[in-house]
Amino acid sequence: MSTTKLTRREQREHAQRFIDTLAGTAFPNSRRIYVHGSQADIRVPMREIELSPTLVGGDKDNPRYEANEPIPVYDTSGPYGDPDIGIDVRQGLAKLRQPWIDARNDCAPLSERSSAYTKARLADDGLDELRFSGLLTPKRAVAGKCVTQLHYARQGIVTPEMEFIAIRENMGRERIRSEVLRQQHAGEGFGARLPENITPEFVRDEVAAGRAIIPANINHPESEPMIIGRNFLVKVNANIGNSAVTSSIEEEVEKLVWSTRWGADTVMDLSTGRYIHETREWILRNSPVPIGTVPIYQALEKVNGIAENLTWEAFRDTLLEQAEQGVDYFTIHAGVLLRYVPMTAKRLTGIVSRGGSIMAKWCLSHHQENFLYQHFREICEICAAYDVSLSLGDGLRPGSIQDANDEAQFSELRTLGELTKIAWEYDVQVMIEGPGHVPMQMIRRNMTEELEHCHEAPFYTLGPLTTDIAPGYDHFTSGIGAAMIGWFGCAMLCYVTPKEHLGLPNKEDVKQGLITYKIAAHAADLAKGHPGAQIRDNAMSKARFEFRWEDQFNLALDPFTARAYHDETLPQESGKVAHFCSMCGPKFCSMKITQEVRDYAAKQNIEAGMADMSHHFRARGGEIYLKQEEA
């Protein structure tokens, strides 16, 4: 990792160059493929990793090879992962879902923006240089209609989004023919229902039951459909966002593209700086993944950062502003109730959630109940009109392992369960946010409590961090907890970067956090027994045993780091075909020795001889020691 510190100007110039030269880029020895659905415009992107053949015999002059089939993998990079697609962030991405949205004939363009704040920003000529030029005309459900994926699912309708997701979740494993690659250990799903083949009808059923959500605002047609639920692949969220003192619009767009390249299934824009509105527009128009926000952050900016001055009216205006821009899910801290705030007084670290602390301060200042709780039905009405999913925030999550699983945390969780049922009355999709800081032995209870009290709505957790002693390495401390809770049933994991508790992450931090959490999510998929999850592991192990170094690099989550580490000690091209690595050397490589043993056994027909001796042993009673007269 580079330790060179760039100035603010250099950072912005670097981001500008990145945007100016941005083009679709494939990973090493990979190509973009599309799996087609029942209609021409359902084209599901995947990345296919090409592998080299295996040497199976012959001699130096006439070697014999056996082909290794390519490995398809889930791909979140959208058009940025396709070298054949031209990229221009000033124009934004193609509107993939627009035909599907229009065909349902249940929404219409607005004649004007609903948000007073949006109108004021659009009228400000001084913002023209910052503004995204190709602004969409926002749509809203027509009177008497609901446009949510949950509503369609409950009506028995399988949408194109659901079919897209079913194809995507199967990860192209139907293309794999090798029995070696298809072998998989049985998992322990703790009640998860994992079918051998995910169908569009299964997707519809899970969404209808509230066990899964499809974050897909009708005003974000650029997004590629994805699903969050415990009966699907574990997903990973990346946080980006500027602040009052750091980062520019260019840098946030760069971080968005970078996040999708390294596997972010969703991205949360947590911007708190001056140009929140304009930054978000650039992000949405260029994002192939769902975008989430915490609207209270922007509402607070509108009252100059004074929590006591927040009002329902200002917050409502912010919801309308963001919904009409295309935000796919809102984190709403509606479970921080006035009566729960005193429960945090005896905590070691009190209230650590930014949104939770804002609402707690408002409640105490006015000695009134949380206005998000009081106006929750109105929030649901807004979400239903645009298909904004709700991520019910854990404002009272523990900020230290000492505070884990306490009265405040679980009281709020039960309230989130009550709010979930209210949201479902409006056909609004819901997921539940969770901790936080929790030692390993206390993690599973978080999952069981959530399933019981929140009616199996998808769980979305920050880690949890399993120890508090490792600032600078909290992507490790939390990755441990993330893998565990993902196995127990958590549907989406919010990444933690090395900068957690220390500062805002840069590009390299974002990558480190995402790789750590992709490992955690994949480990959880393996442990649950998600069909096909082990294919890539099997391909890697086969390549490793056969000393196919290039394939090992290319199958890795991070091919560049894998190659760089190998080349530190074996940089020559001959090192890429060597039947050993730098750790053991040529004479002590266990896999090389094993191959030699196999070759020797084959030549001497030892296996047949051993089988004959085994039969003879069993025929004599199977005893290791025999009396002399029996021998």
Swiss-Prot record:
Pathway: Cofactor biosynthesis; thiamine diphosphate biosynthesis. It comes from the Bacteria. One of its GO terms (molecular function) is zinc ion binding. The keyword Lyase applies. Its cofactor is [4Fe-4S] cluster. It is an enzyme of class 4 (lyase). [4Fe-4S] cluster binds at C581, C584, C589. Binds 1 [4Fe-4S] cluster per subunit. The cluster is coordinated with 3 cysteines and an exchangeable S-adenosyl-L-methionine. Pfam families: ThiC-associated, ThiC_Rad_SAM. Zn(2+) binds at H437, H501. InterPro entries: ThiC, ThiC-associated_dom, ThiC/Bza_core_dom, ThiC/BzaA/B. One of its GO terms (cellular component) is cytosol. GO terms for biological process: thiamine biosynthetic process; thiamine diphosphate biosynthetic process. It catalyses: 5-amino-1-(5-phospho-beta-D-ribosyl)imidazole + S-adenosyl-L-methionine = 4-amino-2-methyl-5-(phosphooxymethyl)pyrimidine + CO + 5'-deoxyadenosine + formate + L-methionine + 3 H(+). The keyword Oxidoreductase does not apply. Substrate binds at N239, M268, Y297, H333, S353, R354, G355, D394, G395, L396, R397, E433, Y460. Its EC number is 4.1.99.17. PANTHER family: PHOSPHOMETHYLPYRIMIDINE SYNTHASE, CHLOROPLASTIC, THIAMINE BIOSYNTHESIS PROTEIN THIC. Catalyzes the synthesis of the hydroxymethylpyrimidine phosphate (HMP-P) moiety of thiamine from aminoimidazole ribotide (AIR) in a radical S-adenosyl-L-methionine (SAM)-dependent reaction. Homodimer. Belongs to the ThiC family. This is Phosphomethylpyrimidine synthase. The gene is thiC.
